[in-house]
A protein has these predicted regions:
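An N-terminal JmjN-like helical accessory module and its immediate linker preceding a catalytic domain
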Residues: 1-75
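Non-catalytic accessory segments adjacent to catalytic cores
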Residues: 2-3, 85-217, 318, 453-455, ...
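A residue-level signal for conserved active-site and pocket-lining positions in enzyme catalytic cores
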Residues: 108, 136, 205, 260, ...
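Active-site pocket-lining segments that scaffold enzyme catalytic pockets across diverse folds
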Residues: 173-258, 302-305, 309, 316, ...
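Cytosolic ligand/metal-binding cores
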Residues: 1-5, 140-168, 261-332, 412-464
Length: 464
């Protein structure tokens, strides 16, 4: 048995009767384990699994079986922080090794806003974070097992853990067939163009920008194979990977956008706004990049987003650091302007208060923030749910990382609803904005292998 060296740690654990769960922190260096094998082995746990991989691979975490969840119908930072504290207080955490580096985390986030959601989002709460029974840190090759003390068999626990890890290692990958697309259609395309036209007419010196999203519906001949999607999601390394099962629904995102992360007292975020198509010809690509870096409209849009984000985090920080000129972010299908921003946080800063303040950024909502958010609630077709919403990892301390759920889709049994949006400003053309959203559908169409060739130059400078 590969974990034999951990037996002494198991034998020396003294159970704390005041704690409801025992969480074991276990090394798995000796096991050859990846995302596909984990999802294959735990195929019967559908509806209670997630995978969160950050863009720079700081996190690559898979969670299986939500053993405990914290949720609320409204996002109130203080109450959410209290719920997190109460959940972690239920846990007796024990390390089966001296050199373990990972930290137990919860996965989840909030919906885009508190607007009453339509039926397709019924599986998700307004605020929700999950503690899984099995949590695999594939970056550090470590695993956490959380088990209710009423279900513990300490004598056979090490053998059970080794059996699961060995079973994952030898799991035979199945469900290799791609989903067969039955139909593909835009939802209310003409109405959406009229909505854009109406928004342009409503914009003024006070109401400067609003981001409007639309949807595309894909139906399949049979149920979409989740393991096939996991394989496809592994193909693109320059974005976040978010795969979130809850009940009968699965939310998937390949977003390029970090909302923010905290490590110790340092907050890191990015202002991302301004985009242009990436093409196959290298010379044309250079023209595209040069255009984006010098285009006044894109630079203005980027500057507005950056200034808004900086303004949001100033109350929580003791100092800020960022460059005045944006850099170029290269993704598989598109280029973005982005500015990295770092802040040293005040000692009493709280990740949920920061989340409440910074979301939604102007890149996914508009300006001014509250006016744009209200306009979206009142006029946009359907509800956003987890689209453009914050999703990520939180720890017992305030360390965390949140991404923005862009380039995304919601999958049910035989259909997928894709989401994309664009920023509407004075002078926006409805037809051009409609075509712009086609570019942003491409990552999810590619995951489903239902690709489109309708790629073109961005006109709105918005990363949604």
């Amino acid at each position: 048995m590969k974990l034999q060296s951990s037996r002494t740690f198991i034998e020396n654990i003294s159970l704390d009767s005041a704690r409801q769960y025992l969480t074991l922190h276990i090394p798995m260096d000796e096991y050859n384990i990846d995302e596909e094998k984990i999802f294959t082995y735990f195929n019967e746990s559908k509806g209670s699994r997630y995978w969160f991989k950050s863009k720079d691979s700081t996190y690559n975490v898979v969670g299986i079986n939500y053993i405990e969840s914290m949720w609320r119908d409204k996002f109130q930072p203080e109450a959410t922080a209290d719920s997190k504290k109460a959940l972690f207080q239920k846990l007796q955490q024990e390390k089966l090794g001296d050199d373990l580096k990972s930290k137990l985390s919860l996965f989840g986030g909030t919906l885009f806003d508190d607007k009453d959601t339509t039926d397709e989002w019924n599986d998700f709460k307004m605020v929700e974070f999950h503690l899984p029974e099995w949590q695999f840190d594939l970056k550090k090759n470590e695993v956490f097992l959380t088990r209710s003390k009423t279900e513990l068999n300490m004598d056979g626990l090490l053998e059970e853990i080794d059996g699961v890890l060995s079973g994952i290692e030898s799991a035979e990958i199945t469900e290799k067939e791609k989903p067969v697309v039955k139909s593909k259609r835009d939802i209310f395309p003409n109405e959406w163009k009229l909505l854009v036209e109406e928004a342009v007419n409503n914009l003024n010196d006070e109401f400067k920008k609003v981001v409007l999203a639309r949807q595309k519906l894909i139906t399949f001949e049979s149920k979409a194979k989740r393991l096939y999607l996991i394989r496809r999601l592994k193909d693109e390394a320059d974005t976040y990977t978010i795969y979130y099962e809850k009940g009968k629904s699965t939310f998937v995102s390949k977003t390029p956008e970090k909302l923010f992360s905290i490590k110790g007292e340092q907050l890191t975020t990015n202002a991302i706004a301004g985009s242009i198509q990436r093409v196959e010809d290298s010379r044309e690509n250079n023209v595209q990049k040069e255009f984006l870096l010098n285009d006044e409209k894109n630079l203005f849009e980027h500057r507005v987003v950056r200034e808004s984000i900086v303004s949001d985090i100033v109350p929580f920080s003791e100092g800020l650091n960022y460059k005045k000129n944006p850099l170029l972010m290269e993704n598989k299908y598109i280029y973005h302007l982005f500015t990295p921003i770092q802040a040293m946080l005040k000692k009493d800063s709280d990740e949920f208060k920061i989340l409440k303040q910074i979301h939604p950024t102007p890149a996914v909502g508009g300006l001014p923030k509250n006016l744009a958010k209200d306009y979206i609630k009142e006029h946009e077709y359907g509800t956003r749910g987890l689209y453009a919403a914050p999703l990520g990892i939180i720890h017992e301390d305030k360390d965390c990382e949140f991404a923005v759920g862009l380039r995304s889709m919601l999958i049910s049994a035989r259909s997928a609803t894709l989401f994309a949006g664009c920023g509407i400003v004075k002078g926006s053309d409805p037809e051009a904005e409609f075509l712009e959203t086609e570019v942003k559908f491409t990552p999810m169409l590619n995951v489903l292998e239902a690709t489109t060739n309708e790629l073109h130059r961005s006109t709105d400078g918005t990363n949604v």
